[in-house]
Curated annotation (Swiss-Prot):
Domain comment as written in the entry: Has three domains with a flexible linker between the domains II and III and assumes an 'L' shape. Domain III is highly mobile and contacts RuvB.
InterPro entries: DNA_helicase_Holl-junc_RuvA_I (IPR013849), Hlx-hairpin-Hlx_DNA-bd_motif (IPR003583), NA-bd_OB-fold (IPR012340), RuvA (IPR000085), RuvA_2-like (IPR010994), RuvA_C (IPR011114), RuvA_C_sf (IPR036267)
UniProt-listed Pfam families: HHH_5, RuvA_C, RuvA_N
Region named Flexible linker: 143-149
Originating species: Staphylococcus aureus (strain JH9)
Similarity-based family: Belongs to the RuvA family.
SUPFAM superfamilies per UniProt: DNA helicase RuvA subunit, C-terminal domain (SSF46929), Nucleic acid-binding proteins (SSF50249), RuvA domain 2-like (SSF47781)
Name this polypeptide is given: Holliday junction branch migration complex subunit RuvA
Record region (Domain II): 64-142
């Protein structure tokens, strides 16, 4: 229904962004809102997919058509909902996920929150041979720098989460420096470490 939303990126939260267009602010759930950070207060185009449930209508947004297509493929798998699909795409590119599927790499897939061995196997069974590994979408509006790592993303998402909890940028400046010196297995782990640093 909504192929994309184009407008001013007004707000950035750990799980979603807000884009204002024609006087309306659209709340858009995203895999990794940090990827949009450099566009805050500027015009942005976000590819979208509207999912209607009994209790809500949710708009999901993506940095490229390839990412959007991967999301739509994942939510067709039994046991995979939008939340799990977003978690997979939060720290992996579509091609990385496709390679894991084609190589039947269950171990790679089970590293994501909410994805157990049974669900990982179902992803492979349902999608192997149906997802094509291609060059990353060349017209993607937003690209994560080549030097950006999963660890960088964990830290940046943790910082967004801490800021959303009300901590000031001044308080978080020292925290970010410390977090960047360590390695974490998840965003939650980085957030917990950050909270300990803030209250210490």
């Amino acid at each position: 229904m909504y192929a994309y939303v184009k407008g001013k990126l007004t707000h950035l939260y750990p799980t979603h962004v807000v884009v204002e267009t024609a006087g309306v602010g659209y709340e858009i759930q995203t895999p990794n809102s940090y990827r949009f950070q450099k566009h805050l207060d500027h015009e942005v185009l976000i590819r979208t997919s509207l999912i209607v449930r009994e209790d809500a209508q949710l708009l999901y947004g993506f940095s490229s058509e390839e990412e959007k297509d991967m999301f739509l493929s994942l939510i067709k798998v039994t046991g995979i909902g939008p939340k799990s699909a977003l978690a997979i795409l939060a720290t992996s590119t579509p091609n990385e996920v496709k390679r894991a599927i084609e190589n039947e790499n269950d171990t790679y897939l089970t590293k994501f929150p909410g994805i157990g061995k049974k669900t990982a196997r179902q992803i492979v069974l349902d999608l192997k041979g149906k997802v094509k590994i291609t060059e990353e979408d060349s017209d993607s509006l937003l690209q994560v720098d080549a030097t950006s790592t999963v660890q960088d993303q964990f830290v940046q998402e943790a910082m967004l989460a801490l800021e959303a909890l009300g901590y000031s940028k001044r308080e978080l400046a020292k925290v970010e420096k410390t977090l960047n010196k360590n390695k974490y297995d998840s965003v939650d782990e980085a957030v917990k470490a950050g909270l300990q640093l803030v209250v210490s």
